[in-house]
């Protein structure tokens, strides 16, 4: 039998100096995606993709690790400055922003883009613990 040769596309090194870091922080996970100014994805990471499972995904430390991984991957493409767009009520918001600054990316602006309903669907009932 002939084995099929699998070809893997090489990652093209883009030369992008500024972009947007989208931090989506939920109660269960934190996702960090770094895009160029037009919105094309350059690098992304999440707490779950780094091996955190269950309730450990929702910790600030997991958000910090996800932000570091995404920042390092984007710096390979020449990223130097980012605007930060934070979405969601999760615990990893501030930790992810601090981690982006600690890796050497210059944060030029921080925006909160959490969607606020104009009385949309009914929210889930309050937890009684």
Curated annotation (Swiss-Prot):
Entry GO CC: ribonucleoprotein complex; ribosome
Molecular functions per Gene Ontology: rRNA binding; structural constituent of ribosome
Cytoplasm among keywords: no
UniProt keyword list: Ribonucleoprotein, Ribosomal protein, RNA-binding, rRNA-binding
Coiled coil regions in record: none
Subunit relationships: Part of the 30S ribosomal subunit. Interacts with proteins S7 and S18. Binds to IF-3.
Name used for this protein in its record: Small ribosomal subunit protein uS11
Originating organism: Lactiplantibacillus plantarum (strain ATCC BAA-793 / NCIMB 8826 / WCFS1)
Lineage: Bacteria, Bacillati, Bacillota, Bacilli, Lactobacillales
Gene transcribed to yield this protein: rpsK
């Amino acid at each position: 039998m002939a084995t099929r040769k699998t070809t893997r596309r090489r990652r093209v090194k883009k030369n992008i100096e500024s972009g947007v870091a989208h931090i989506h922080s939920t109660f269960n996970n934190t996702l960090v995606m770094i895009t160029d100014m037009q919105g094309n994805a350059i690098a992304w990471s999440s707490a779950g993709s780094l091996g955190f499972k269950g309730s450990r995904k929702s910790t600030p430390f997991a958000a910090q690790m996800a932000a570091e991984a995404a920042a390092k991957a984007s710096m390979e493409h020449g990223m130097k400055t980012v605007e930060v767009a934070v979405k969601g009520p999760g615990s990893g918001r501030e930790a992810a922003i601090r981690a982006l600054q600690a890796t050497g990316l210059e944060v030029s602006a921080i925006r909160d883009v959490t969607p606020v309903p104009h009385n949309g669907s009914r929210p889930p009932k309050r937890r009684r613990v």
